[in-house]
Swiss-Prot record:
PANTHER family: 4'-PHOSPHOPANTETHEINE PHOSPHATASE, PANTOTHENATE KINASE. Keywords: ATP-binding, Coenzyme A biosynthesis, Cytoplasm, Kinase, Nucleotide-binding, Transferase. Its EC number is 2.7.1.33. The gene is coaW. It comes from Bacillus cereus (strain B4264). NCBIfam families: panK_eukar, PRK13317.1. The keyword Kinase applies. It catalyses: (R)-pantothenate + ATP = (R)-4'-phosphopantothenate + ADP + H(+). Homodimer. ATP binds at residues 8-15, 105, 127-131, 143, 230. This is Type II pantothenate kinase.
Length: 273
């Protein structure tokens, strides 16, 4: 293994990026609260001498690392943007101005102009919301278990759509748009399945994050919105919710292959440049 690794210690997940013996970019992922597993992995890879670390849990993780490593700190968004720029180049995208929406535990949104960036805002709604509400409503709290269920679940018995409100009357906007997330739960007596509840939770998160991103994009007249974050990893249903809503508003959504690892990639590149 190479001597340098990049770590993005997030609120829920900790991602590690490094170049393997074949010089291929490689990733590891741990739950951030399982810090003993992270430390064990680092210690078991004897060649590691330098660590560039970023993310909200970086200070806590540093306290557990011994003095045998050279530690470099990097601001979270500087690392994320460097990783995003790297992936954009690898995927042959030529986009200079875009909205960058990072769906982690919560969601942060930035304007990016070439290599300059300005924080637009954010929301506490994100991957942590999916996991928290899933735990409260279905007692399922592992993301790997949630995702398959969202694929088979239906939101029809829980969400109120525009069409539900207008009935057969011509509505001013698309009948399929959500008028109220979980609105039917208060007015019906249905026994909803876990898959339906989880699909509806994910719909709520996807629509809130997308609506906020679209508002910022419209304000600055920006066409492209890049959505990244571990919440999107292997989450086809959430990507579909986001892309459909984004395209409905005449904006272009982009999902990067390794977008959830952007922070770790940026940290690695910073230490190896």
């Amino acid at each position: 293994m190479e001597r340098t690794i990049g770590i993005d210690a997030g609120g829920t997940l900790t991602k590690i990026a490094y170049f393997n013996k074949k010089k291929l970019l490689t990733f590891e992922k741990f739950y951030s609260h399982e810090q003993h597993k992270i430390i064990d992995w680092i210690k078991n890879n004897n060649g590691i001498k330098q660590i560039c670390i970023t993310g909200g849990k970086s200070k806590l993780l540093q306290q557990l690392l011994t003095g045998s490593y050279k530690i470099i700190e990097l601001s979270e968004f500087e690392a994320t943007l460097a990783g995003v720029q790297f992936i954009l180049k690898e995927e042959q995208h030529t986009i200079n101005n875009f909205i960058l929406t990072n769906i982690g535990t919560g969601t942060s949104i930035h304007y990016v102009y070439n290599e300059q960036y300005i924080r637009a805002g954010g929301t506490g709604v994100g991957g942590g919301t999916i996991m928290g509400l899933s735990k409260l409503l279905t007692n399922i709290d592992h993301f790997e278990d949630i995702i398959p269920l969202t694929k088979v679940g239906s939101r029809k018995e829980l969400d109120i759509t525009v069409g539900d409100i207008y009935g057969g009357i011509l509505s001013p906007i698309d009948n399929n748009l959500t008028a109220s997330n979980f609105g039917k739960a208060a007015i019906t007596e249905s026994n909803n399945s876990s898959s339906d509840i989880l699909a509806t939770v994910q719909g709520l998160v996807g629509e809130v994050v997308t609506a906020l991103s679209l508002q910022f994009a419209e304000t600055k007249n920006i066409e492209h919105i890049i959505y990244i974050g571990s919440t999107l990893c292997n989450n086809v249903q959430l990507q579909h919710i986001i892309s459909s809503y984004t395209e409905y508003q005449n904006k272009t959504p982009i999902f990067l292959q390794d977008g959830g690892n952007s922070g770790a990639i940026g940290a690695l590149l910073h230490a190896t440049k």
